[in-house]
Amino acid sequence: MEVLYSLSKTLKDARDKIVEGTLYSNVSDLIQQFNQMIVTMNGNEFQTGGIGNLPIRNWTFDFGLLGTTLLNLDANYVENARTTIEYFIDFIDNVCMDEIARESQRNGIAPQSEALRKLSGIKFKRINFDNSSDYIENWNLQNRRQRTGFVFHKPNILPYSASFTLNRSQPAHDNLMGTMWINAGSEIQVAGFDYSCALNAPANIQQFEHVVPLRRALTTATITLLPDAERFSFPRVINSADGTTTWYFNPVILRPSNVEVEFLLNGQIINTYQARFGTIIARNFDTIRLSFQLVRPPNMTPAVANLFPQAPPFIFHATVGLTLRIESAVCESVLADASETLLANVTSVRQEYAIPVGPVFPPGMNWTELITNYSPSREDNLQRVFTVASIRSMLIK
């Protein structure tokens, strides 16, 4: 993997910097590195493809070295270099796609394609120029079963989940009380509602709670907490739990009271915040518990009193909600990230070449299914293909 990264980094620099008119002295170190790459690769043969619709291609390396000059690089020099650069880039692209297309239930962190296995040989270690990539560093740690740490801006750690629970219901569905939520990616929105606006609740207060377990622990997380759940702020028709009917939800939004968010790790509370909105920090957690209250307003203007009558029918439904967004966090497991294109790159390659469903990844790389059942085998394979996708993205946009 390190060799693949070094090849790609060298080729990217060569493509960007070996241009007509450049002083040779400005790129002499790069050209020496480029020539070392050619010397190491010359005389070797590789084969890529042969899975799905990814065609089999054979690669041979027999290229001349780039010379020295005291002057600027001229058109002939650059054209000669370009021919070599483009062939190498095409080779790297196909090695990456071949690797992305493959998966294994055992030792999925290791190279799976014939070409990358060959590049992992001792004879190619002379190409190991630069391993400054975060993904390369973490691939090495994961490969040695040591602790890794990935910094994500918005970790897609929450499988999609959208549902409701009713704490009070009737066959007519005309006086309901409960919670509804949507969890996806890095955001949680939860709403508590009571058609009667806590009319008969103790002290006219309804208590709500929403617990969200994560598939992997996060550390040093920056989180935004807001006293609103905008996705539940408009009327909608909802299918009943048994699917036999539908019920009407017509929210009127109140501000939640006594809001508390707890971050837990292995059942132990690590951080607790009460009535604090905006930016909050969580040190280490694998579960989030949100609790909040709906308090019936003790004093109402006539207009508000008309919204929340003392007896049915209840046309408007008192609702309070919270939004929690994980803006950034460190995770020891590889995850899709809203600010990166690695999952999209991997999925598009597998779709474009009709890669058959294997023993590890779900059909279509369905992220919700993948993260819901996030096994060590999936984590290893995802670490490998994301690392390869990050290398490929250096050359192929």
From Swiss-Prot:
Keywords: Calcium, Capsid protein, Intermediate capsid protein, Metal-binding, Ubl conjugation, Virion, Zinc. One of its GO terms (biological process) is fusion of virus membrane with host plasma membrane. Ca(2+) binds at residues 266, 286. Residues 62-73 are annotated as: Interaction with the inner capsid protein VP2. Pfam families: Rota_Capsid_VP6 (PF00980). One of its GO terms (cellular component) is viral envelope. GO terms for molecular function: host cell surface receptor binding; metal ion binding; structural molecule activity. The N-terminus is blocked. Gene3D superfamilies: 2.60.120.170, Viral capsid alpha domain. Zn(2+) binds at residue 153. The keyword Metal-binding applies. It is found in: Virion. It comes from the Viruses. Belongs to the rotavirus VP6 family. Intermediate capsid protein that self assembles to form an icosahedral capsid with a T=13 symmetry, which consists of 230 trimers of VP6, with channels at each of its five-fold vertices. This capsid constitutes the middle concentric layer of the viral mature particle. The innermost VP2 capsid and the intermediate VP6 capsid remain intact following cell entry to protect the dsRNA from degradation and to prevent unfavorable antiviral responses in the host cell during all the replication cycle of the virus. The VP6 trimer contains a zinc ion located at the center of the molecule. The zinc ion is not essential for either trimerization or transcription activity of the DLP. Zinc-depleted VP6 has an increased sensitivity to proteases. Homotrimer. Interacts with the inner capsid protein VP2. Interacts with the outer capsid glycoprotein VP7. Interacts with the outer capsid protein VP5*. This is Intermediate capsid protein VP6. It comes from Rotavirus A (strain RVA/Pig/United States/OSU/1977/G5P9[7]) (RV-A). The lineage of its organism: Viruses, Riboviria, Orthornavirae, Duplornaviricota, Resentoviricetes.
